Amino acid sequence: MTETTTKKRWYVLQAFSGFEGRVATTLREYIKLHQMEDQFGEVLVPTEEVVENVAGKRRKSERKFFPGYVLVQMEMNDETWHLVRSVPRVMGFIGGTADKPAPISQREADRILNRLQESSEKPRHRKEFQPGEEVRVTEGPFADFNGTVEEVDYEKGRLKVSVSIFGRATPVELEFSQVEKTN
């Protein structure tokens, strides 16, 4: 670890699962404490906002899309390496060797950052349905009927389900909260 890179690159840290937020906060505090802000950029726990329907009410929550990992933008040198490794609950860097971690590619970093941006603009639904999937209607006039998903509209949180009524397939529009997956 004798090379000094002058450009900040993105590295992935493995943290104890469930402690990603605490690791990110502690790392930011260590960076300030050791006055190394010029050698570090962002410290991120990649999360996305998801919307779920609970008892007919829409509720937003955050979900980590890389559980157990923290992204760090930094210049890699002996001091920054030791600072990161000294943070409690950090198991190490992902990629490269223990002494010389490898950064993720700029393309990978851009993909993750774009996903973070999209999530903040438009929350995803926790329930994900696919056309052709079998569901059971749980509420409304078609309760206890089984059907096949034909269309999914995540913007409105609605599905078009083909329900068999008296032997005929009938398309029915339902909200995500009115159905559950059968398998």
Swiss-Prot record:
<dbReference type="InterPro" id="IPR005824">
    <property type="entry name" value="KOW"/>
</dbReference>
<dbReference type="GO" id="GO:0006353">
    <property type="term" value="P:DNA-templated transcription termination"/>
</dbReference>
<dbReference type="InterPro" id="IPR008991">
    <property type="entry name" value="Translation_prot_SH3-like_sf"/>
</dbReference>
<keyword id="KW-0805">Transcription regulation</keyword>
<dbReference type="GO" id="GO:0140673">
    <property type="term" value="P:transcription elongation-coupled chromatin remodeling"/>
</dbReference>
<keyword id="KW-0806">Transcription termination</keyword>
<dbReference type="GO" id="GO:0005829">
    <property type="term" value="C:cytosol"/>
</dbReference>
<dbReference type="InterPro" id="IPR006645">
    <property type="entry name" value="NGN-like_dom"/>
</dbReference>
<feature type="domain" description="KOW">
    <location>
        <begin position="131"/>
        <end position="161"/>
    </location>
</feature>
<dbReference type="GO" id="GO:0031564">
    <property type="term" value="P:transcription antitermination"/>
</dbReference>
<dbReference type="GO" id="GO:0032784">
    <property type="term" value="P:regulation of DNA-templated transcription elongation"/>
</dbReference>
<dbReference type="InterPro" id="IPR036735">
    <property type="entry name" value="NGN_dom_sf"/>
</dbReference>
<keyword id="KW-0889">Transcription antitermination</keyword>
<protein>
    <recommendedName>
        <fullName>Transcription termination/antitermination protein NusG</fullName>
    </recommendedName>
</protein>
<comment type="similarity">
    <text>Belongs to the NusG family.</text>
</comment>
<dbReference type="InterPro" id="IPR047050">
    <property type="entry name" value="NGN"/>
</dbReference>
<dbReference type="InterPro" id="IPR043425">
    <property type="entry name" value="NusG-like"/>
</dbReference>
<comment type="function">
    <text>Participates in transcription elongation, termination and antitermination.</text>
</comment>
<dbReference type="InterPro" id="IPR001062">
    <property type="entry name" value="Transcrpt_antiterm_NusG"/>
</dbReference>
<dbReference type="Pfam" id="PF02357">
    <property type="entry name" value="NusG"/>
</dbReference>
<dbReference type="InterPro" id="IPR014722">
    <property type="entry name" value="Rib_uL2_dom2"/>
</dbReference>
<dbReference type="InterPro" id="IPR015869">
    <property type="entry name" value="Transcrpt_antiterm_NusG_bac_CS"/>
</dbReference>
<dbReference type="Pfam" id="PF00467">
    <property type="entry name" value="KOW"/>
</dbReference>
<keyword id="KW-0804">Transcription</keyword>
